[in-house]
Amino acid sequence: MNHVGVICPNTPGHVNAMLALADATRARGHRVTFFLLGKPPASIATAGFETVSLGGTVFPADAYQAEFQKLGSLQDRAALKHTLAIGARAADAVLEVGPAVVRTTGVTALVVDQVSFPGGTVADQLGLPFATVCNALLLNPDPSIPPYFTHWYPRDAWWARIRNRIAWMGLNRLYAPIMTRIQNHRRNLGLSVPTGISDIWSDKLQISQQPELFEFPRRELPKQVRFVGPLHRSSDSQPVPFPWERLDGRPLIYASLGTLQNRIAGMFRVIAEACEGLDAQLVISTGNGMSPEALGKL
């Protein structure tokens, strides 16, 4: 029996997908332990898995949750910068606390979320094999497509490739505080030093829960990337009240801002205004970010 460790952000969109993988791994006779920053979500214990804290005094649970609470009300570049600031502080915690904690539990392999940048370094430091899982949009740089944070369409033109390359370079500059921490840590240990963000992910297996057709046409997709489609457990679903009687047979438009930025009331209003006059019904999911009443009359 192997003992697989999971390192991922402590947010529903990442944890729930990893729970699906953990469930499938356990069904094959292996043990799974989650390593998280922040307060362990009830969903992990309910599913029968153990959680071990990675934060220590470097990034305490309360501070971690407060940072994500703030992220929920940010958008555009402000949201991206705050996300990367969280990532830098998380990198300090994972690199300082992670190796000893993971070693103590006796883990034999790691499954690391693509945005948990220092997770692969923990695996390399301990001599453990690891796989990378992309639970968001695929982050792998590719000058043939626009970066994930832009609103651009892909264009097969020289000017578009230059535009894309400049944007990816700008993103690399934002990654720099995290990358510098990882590079210094690995250099001190005598490990190979990554030159770019792509070097920190698994060179054996990278799983994306996107359907392949959802991704822009890439020219530089690593051979180890596998598109497997959505990762979910049937037992994840919780009953949510819904006014079924208000459906009138017209096509439905479903709008959600996910689990990280679902407190941007203005964005929901923009979506509602964009749907005005269409021969369709709009269903807005606010998740746990805000109550529907907070949006007022749309």
Q: Where do the protein language model's features map onto the residues?
A:
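N-terminal subdomain of nucleotide-sugar transferases
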Residues: 1-53
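Generic beta-sheet signal
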Residues: 35-37, 54-57, 113, 133-136, ...
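Conserved nucleotide-sugar donor-interacting segment of glycosyltransferase catalytic cores
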Residues: 88-161, 213-214
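Active-site-proximal region of nucleotide-activated glycan assembly enzymes
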Residues: 131-216, 222
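Donor-nucleotide binding loops and adjacent catalytic segments primarily
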Residues: 210-298
